[in-house]
């Protein structure tokens, strides 16, 4: 039996809270209500179920009357929460860089920080580039801070990350970024990992979502503009290492490309559905360059649509 599909885009925040009864901020509640029909995109596919899993998601299904045996165990959810933390991505990229040993790869400055000390100011001063700081669990630009100085504002933000979530990720901020893209996967029950395809998207400086291109894989690879053989090597690495993880479901690994052609191979790992996978499903269903209204027209709220091949979430206010 497939679970009813639900669009719970607040799931990353629910993972941070780690409670069964979680209520997201009112604006996010409105977004989830306005965009509820977006779940129709994946309800009859292998992705049927929630956008993302957490204790709060499990409780929501219980309240819908779903039998306990159809829901994941609390132990599985605890492991998913660990995997979904950006702390896990820090360890993952460290191993990736050590194994692949390719000068085209970035990410060596990415690290996990669980305390602040007087030497941090010195660490800032020896670099001539800004940093981006991210809390362990957040989405679409929330829980993100970009700074080039260890000033009072930055210290306050970082102390907030430490107090609320126990740490943060520190990485170089790539001002010369020219492209956001991702590799999308599905991990099966037998540990076999399917490569679903590439996705190309646009995000703001602080990571807020803009749009995804709904195009063929050939068009997306051309947009990415990286040696296909190198992409295949990177994809094979991810498939192999995802097969070792105690998880079943969709995975998206976000990356970026800089102006000189270097690649950050793992900005973060999303162990849930994402807009890139939706873009793949929509291309399969409607083709490239399509225009579709995915949720009801909303003159005073959120709506999801594809406009001339760009999948986006729009907010309108009268």
Tell what function each PLM region has.
Residues 119-129:
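Intrinsic disorder/low-complexity segments
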Residues 131-157, 180-182, 205-221:
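Glycine-rich phosphate-binding loop of ATP-grasp-fold ATP-dependent ligases
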Residues 7-12, 27-120, 139:
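Conserved N-proximal alpha/beta basic substrate-recognition cap immediately N-terminal to
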Residues 93, 127-146, 166-176, 253, ...:
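ATP-grasp fold ATP-binding core
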């Amino acid at each position: 039996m497939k679970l009813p599909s639900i669009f719970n885009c607040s799931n990353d925040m629910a993972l941070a809270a780690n409670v069964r009864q979680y209520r997201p901020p009112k604006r996010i509640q409105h977004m989830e209500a306005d965009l509820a029909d977006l779940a129709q995109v994946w309800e009859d596919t292998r992705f049927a179920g929630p956008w993302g899993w957490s204790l709060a998601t499990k409780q929501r299904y219980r309240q819908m009357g779903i039998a306990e045996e159809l829901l994941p165990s609390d132990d599985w959810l605890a492991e998913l929460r660990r995997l979904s933390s950006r702390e896990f991505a820090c360890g993952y990229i460290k191993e990736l860089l050590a194994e692949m040993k390719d000068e085209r790869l970035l990410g060596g400055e990415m690290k996990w920080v669980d305390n602040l000390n007087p030497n941090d100011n010195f660490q800032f001063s020896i670099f001539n580039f800004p940093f981006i700081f991210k809390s362990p669990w957040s989405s679409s630009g929330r829980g993100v801070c970009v700074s080039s100085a260890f000033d009072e504002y930055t210290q306050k933000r970082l102390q907030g990350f430490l107090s609320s979530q126990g740490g943060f990720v520190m990485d170089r901020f790539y001002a010369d970024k020219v492209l956001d893209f991702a590799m999308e996967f599905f991990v099966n029950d037998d540990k076999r990992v399917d490569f679903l395809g590439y996705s190309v998207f646009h995000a703001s400086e602080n990571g807020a979502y803009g749009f995804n291109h709904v195009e063929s894989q050939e068009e997306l690879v051309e947009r990415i503009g990286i040696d296909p053989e190198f992409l295949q090597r990177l994809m094979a690495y991810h498939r192999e290492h995802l097969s070792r993880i105690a998880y079943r479901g969709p995975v998206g690994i976000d990356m970026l490309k800089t102006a000189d052609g270097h690649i950050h191979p793992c900005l973060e790992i999303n162990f849930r559905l994402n807009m890139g996978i939706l873009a793949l499903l929509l291309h399969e269903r409607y083709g490239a360059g399509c225009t579709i209204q995915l949720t009801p027209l909303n003159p005073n709220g959120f709506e999801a649509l594809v406009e001339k091949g760009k999948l986006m979430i729009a907010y309108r206010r009268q």
